[in-house]
């Protein structure tokens, strides 16, 4: 598995903080917590209205260094959605965040007019970095329409979850994007890696519901630590 992409924290933190503060500028004067620089790139988002999209793609190693989307994704990725919601709620992130299941239910109540948050047209941006390049269509409109079902402007997209069980090891990572739905820009992108396990039972069960629950909890915990450290 490729190593985590290095992220220059100070510039990214400043960019995210500026975007968050700009998005809230019309709501009144800033509090001291708004003005303080965040201790991690995502530590400023916990108190905001946020959307966490359902996880999109589950991939395993393919030929020639590629990562292939697996057919187990639709059955296993909702487990990651549950774990992300659970870990963040344990840290006090509640009513101001809309998680994958709630967003899907809201979209379903709209009769499909808002699209399906579980099936975004996101295949082409799996490795897209943060920057000023806007998301392509129809993805930009899909995200904007779905986020508009909530009070949020910013969205977290767990776009790709990688599971590698080669060489008797279980290695995992989830690529997470922080998106400004209004401008369709990626503000932050990173590969969050889970712990490596060499336990034969853990390796063999990685793609079972039980084994995937374990690795999903590990990944969700590491992401939640970036939002609210424990």
Question: Where would I find each of the regions flagged by the language model?
Answer:
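N-terminal segment of the mature soluble domain
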Residues: 64-155, 218
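C-terminal motif of bacterial Sec signal peptides marking the signal peptidase cleavage site
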Residues: 21-23
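C-terminal/domain-edge helix-coil "capping" segments
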Residues: 25-51, 56-62, 135-151, 160-230
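Bacterial N-terminal signal peptides that target proteins for export
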Residues: 2-13
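Short secondary-structure transition/capping segments
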Residues: 3-4, 109, 167-169
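A general boundary/transition motif marking the beginning of the first structured unit of a protein
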Residues: 3-5, 68, 72, 76, ...
């Amino acid at each position: 598995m490729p190593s985590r992409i290095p992220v220059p924290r100070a510039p990214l933190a400043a960019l995210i903080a500026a975007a968050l503060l700009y998005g809230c500028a019309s709501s009144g004067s800033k509090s001291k917590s708004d003005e303080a620089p965040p201790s991690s790139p995502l530590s400023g988002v916990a108190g905001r209205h946020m959307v966490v999209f359902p996880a999109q793609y589950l991939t395993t190693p393919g030929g020639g260094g590629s990562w292939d989307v697996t057919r187990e994704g639709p059955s296993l990725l909702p487990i990651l959605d549950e774990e992300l919601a659970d870990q963040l709620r344990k840290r006090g992130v509640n009513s101001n965040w809309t998680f994958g299941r709630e967003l899907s239910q809201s979209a379903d109540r709209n009769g499909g007019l808002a699209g399906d948050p579980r099936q975004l047209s996101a295949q082409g941006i799996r490795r897209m970095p943060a920057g000023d390049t806007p998301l392509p269509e129809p993805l930009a409109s899909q995200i904007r329409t779905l986020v508009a079902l909530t009070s949020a402007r910013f969205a977290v997209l767990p776009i790709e979850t990688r599971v590698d069980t080669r060489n008797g090891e279980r290695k995992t990572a989830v690529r997470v994007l922080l998106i400004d739905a209004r401008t369709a820009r990626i503000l932050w992108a990173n590969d969050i890696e889970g712990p490596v396990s060499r336990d034969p039972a853990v390796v063999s069960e990685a793609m079972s519901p039980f084994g995937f629950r374990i690795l999903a909890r590990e990944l969700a915990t590491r992401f939640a630590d970036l939002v609210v450290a424990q």
